[in-house]
Amino acid sequence: MNEAVSPGALSTLFTDARTHNGWRETPVSDETLREIYALMKWGPTSANCSPARIVFTRTAEGKERLRPALSSGNLQKTLTAPVTAIVAWDSEFYERLPLLFPHGDARSWFTSSPQLAEETAFRNSSMQAAYLIVACRALGLDTGPMSGFDRQHVDDAFFTGSTLKSNLLINIGYGDSSKLYARLPRLSFEEACGLL
């Protein structure tokens, strides 16, 4: 049986963590990005399919390629973030299943149903994006996930000729708490959950 993490860890991961819009000028190293992936890859996915593919955009050139795809409200926060992760999904993720799920012919589940393959890739890459956020927080980083962007432009700018399709963007860095908005409410258990 697993032990519960400490109250401090819960605060870091959930209750005190915030979505950041402004950033300190502290770089995020490539080694740290590797640490993030080394943690997030262990989060569960359907049949261990692991469809997420991530481009960590950290150069001025990379940010300029992103610029035309960003909504006006997401522009400045993204251009000033040390890193913007483009979380994409691989439409042919099932080609890796003989390695990732050797217990049966899982590849055929998806090659026989393009709709199931797309739904599985999108849903599971979304879960993996959440694992990325938790991994960042566990390593002392802050994040700002965004869905306000032109997916087609990102796909054209970064993934032309590949099997990848963008899902969402996540800014990563060390947040400037002076630029935080007031904490917004969340739904209560009674409003969001049911017991059967």
Curated annotation (Swiss-Prot):
InterPro entries, sorted: Nitroreductase, Nitroreductase-like, Nitroreductase_HadB/RutE, RutE-like
Keywords of the record: Flavoprotein, FMN, NADP, Oxidoreductase
Catalytic class of the enzyme: oxidoreductase
EC number assigned by the record: 1.1.1.298
Deletion phenotype: Cells lacking this gene lose the ability to utilize pyrimidine nucleosides and bases as the sole source of nitrogen at room temperature.
Names of required cofactors: FMN
Induction entry: Up-regulated by the nitrogen regulatory protein C (NtrC also called GlnG) and repressed by RutR.
GO molecular function: 3-hydroxypropionate dehydrogenase (NADP+) activity; FMN binding
One family name in Pfam for this protein: Nitroreductase
Catalytic activity annotation: 3-hydroxypropanoate + NADP(+) = 3-oxopropanoate + NADPH + H(+)
Keyword presence, NADP: yes
Keyword Calcium: no
Biological process according to GO: DNA damage response; nitrogen utilization; pyrimidine nucleobase catabolic process; uracil catabolic process
PANTHER family listed in its UniProt record: MALONIC SEMIALDEHYDE REDUCTASE RUTE-RELATED
Family stated for the protein in its record: Belongs to the nitroreductase family. HadB/RutE subfamily.
Cited HAMAP family: Oxidoreductase_RutE_HadB
Primary role: May reduce toxic product malonic semialdehyde to 3-hydroxypropionic acid, which is excreted. RutE is apparently supplemented by YdfG. Required in vivo, but not in vitro in pyrimidine nitrogen degradation.
Miscellaneous remark of the record: The Rut pathway degrades exogenous pyrimidines as the sole nitrogen source at room temperature but not at 37 degrees Celsius, a restriction that is apparently a consequence of an inadequate ability to remove toxic malonic semialdehyde at the higher temperature (RutE/YdfG function).
Protein name, per record: Probable malonic semialdehyde reductase RutE
Gene behind this protein: rutE
